[in-house]
Design a protein with these regions (language model features):
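Membrane-helix boundary elements
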Residues: 58-60, 224-229, 238-265
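Alpha-helical transmembrane segments in multipass membrane proteins, preferentially the mid-helix core
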Residues: 143-154, 219-222, 274-290, 336-341
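N-terminal signal-anchor module of multipass membrane proteins
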Residues: 1-75
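Alpha-helical transmembrane segments of multi-pass integral membrane proteins
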Residues: 31-37, 103-115, 164-186, 205-219, ...
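Short aromatic-rich membrane-water interface segments that cap or initiate transmembrane helices
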Residues: 60-64, 194-208, 335
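Terminal transmembrane helical module of multi-pass membrane proteins
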Residues: 4, 291-354
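Membrane-interface helix-loop-helix junctions at boundaries between adjacent transmembrane segments
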Residues: 90-182, 187-201
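A loop-to-helix transmembrane entry motif
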Residues: 203-210, 260-274
Length: 354
């Protein structure tokens, strides 16, 4: 029988340095291991090998959430730098650096909110329980490791569609956390912006969430329209402008509080809806290649927002309900828009290659 080596050359082994995906996966695993070791080591002097509560001040949940946030932010920055060294894509200006910083912060906050919520749920499941010394080290290290791993892979695979998901996750998590920790339990009887009018940590978190989310929308707009296929002359610029306006107005909602700058706050909130409406109505003219089946989705969302606003004016619905539904519809549309643009881009590239 002929030895396997003599039957054919077989597939050539690719050197590790040329296996980019494998290298990135190994790097993510290495960063996760590093985060585990560092966070577990820091937990030694923090908890002094003593038991700790699951959630609340001085708890393993609080420590793990903060450590995971730092690990996620640093890992995301490391992932973008890894792509930068491979010129895929290369950061070429201040805006690119600011984009990376904002996205790293968003990943850190998502990790912070996620682990805080997980700890709160576990505390409700195990009422009165404490975590022993060694599990404290293991749990906190594991939380940081998982967060670093996910954030690094998110950074190296970041695209318009994933960025839209990150934006939605960040915005929903921030608003939900503010609502759960609001000093006024009846805030919803007034409007959503009431979450940002007090001086407590919950209000600051709400306003910061809106500002960062607004900036992320502008980042998303730049990324999504950079190579928008089949856009007419000037269409790409107009789509970019409309999305940027949505982001800027969203950030301004967090900057100008409803209790101190009512008219400015109302103007920018209304402007966000107007910009969204213009974009959905004019999208077909600006991007002729966009799916015809997608266009009625935007029109329907806009019609629902207008009807809800009319119901609020007539006294049937509260402003909170209108704001929540409008926010969900706008950002759902943005996510769907990114997916349709991605599909259009792929089809255009396939058609050009054929």
């Amino acid at each position: 029988m002929t030895p396997p080596a003599e039957q054919g050359a077989g597939p050539a082994r690719v050197p590790l340095r040329e296996r980019e995906n494998t290298t990135l996966e190994l790097t993510a695993t290495g960063l996760a291991a590093l985060a585990f070791v560092v966070v577990a080591a820091v937990a030694l002097p923090v908890f002094r090998l003593e038991a700790a509560p699951i959630s609340g001040p001085g708890s393993v949940g609080q420590y793990a959430a903060v450590a995971a946030a730092v690990a996620a932010a640093l890992a995301f920055a490391a992932g973008r730098y890894a792509l930068h060294t491979r010129s895929r894509p290369r950061m070429g200006g201040v805006l690119d650096v600011v984009d990376v910083a904002a996205l790293a912060l968003a990943h850190g906050i998502i990790a912070l909110l996620g682990w805080t919520l997980a700890a709160a749920i576990m505390a409700e499941a195990f009422i009165g329980a404490t975590v022993f010394a060694l599990p404290v080290l293991a749990v906190s290290g594991a939380a940081a490791a998982v967060s670093a791993y996910i954030a690094f892979l998110s950074a190296v695979n970041m695209g318009p569609q994933l960025l839209a998901v990150v934006l939605a996750t960040f915005l929903v998590g921030g608003v939900l956390a503010s609502a759960l920790t609001a000093s006024d339990p009846e805030w919803w009887m007034q409007n959503l912006s009431t979450l940002g009018i007090s001086d407590d940590l919950s209000a600051r978190a709400f306003n910061i969430t809106l500002v960062i989310a607004g900036f992320l929308v502008t980042v998303l707009a730049r990324v999504a329209t950079r190579e928008l296929p089949t856009a007419t002359a000037g269409g790409q610029r107009r789509v970019l402008g409309a999305l940027v306006l949505v982001g800027v107005f969203l950030g301004c909602v967090g900057i100008f509080n409803v209790d101190t700058r009512f008219w400015i706050h109302t103007a920018v909130a209304s402007g966000m809806v107007v910009a969204f409406g213009v974009l959905t109505i004019r999208l077909r003219a600006w991007v002729p290649g966009i799916s015809r089946a997608f266009l009625p989705v935007g029109w329907a969302f806009l019609a629902i927002i207008v009807v809800l606003a009319a119901f609020f004016a007539a006294g049937y619905y509260s402003l909170t309900a209108v704001e929540l539904v409008a926010g969900v519809l706008v950002f759902t549309w943005i996510i769907l828009f990114q997916r349709n643009v991605g599909a259009l881009d792929a089809d255009t590239a396939r058609g050009g290659a054929a």
